[in-house]
Amino acid sequence: MGLPFHYVDLRAFCYATEDEDRVRDALRTVLPPDAAIEAAEGEGHHGDPIVILSARVERSAEIDAIFDRLRESIDIDRVREELDERLDGNNAVYVGLDKQAAARGEIALGEGITLRAKVEAYPAKRETALENAREALR
């Protein structure tokens, strides 16, 4: 039985000063090997071009593999303790990952990559989602 997540989204911005392939590789550090990464063109605060790289993982085994890697690499107890702040109004858990570390093939808490995991909760109430997420992150 898989973890109680509908899907996991990963997103990173690639700024004009960054190599897009390097940012893709950073995402691949967290993603399953065959995950498709989509690119969308955007514009930064000052009008500079930005490429938004994103991927969605929906298969249970792949979601489990992502969380297994997170458990091995980051302070998962900290994430679990901070769930109340990390869970949004749509019952999605957010975890920021260090883009520079991921570019080196490592996974660490930080900034640059946003992981969003939509928690299964029936009924779709915050308390149920928190309980399910806490259990999943053990």
Locate predicted features.
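Short, conserved charged micro-motifs
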Residues: 18-22, 61-67, 125-130
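Mid-chain, well-packed structural core segment of small domains
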Residues: 67-102
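Glycine-rich, aromatic-bearing surface loops/beta-hairpins
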Residues: 95-138
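Long, hydrophobic N-terminal alpha-helical segment
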Residues: 1-37
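Beta-strand elements of well-folded, non-transmembrane domains
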Residues: 12-16, 31, 59-61, 99-101, ...
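A common structural junction motif
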Residues: 30-35, 73-77, 113-116, 137-138
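Short amphipathic alpha-helices in soluble, non-transmembrane regions
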Residues: 23-28, 66-74, 131-133
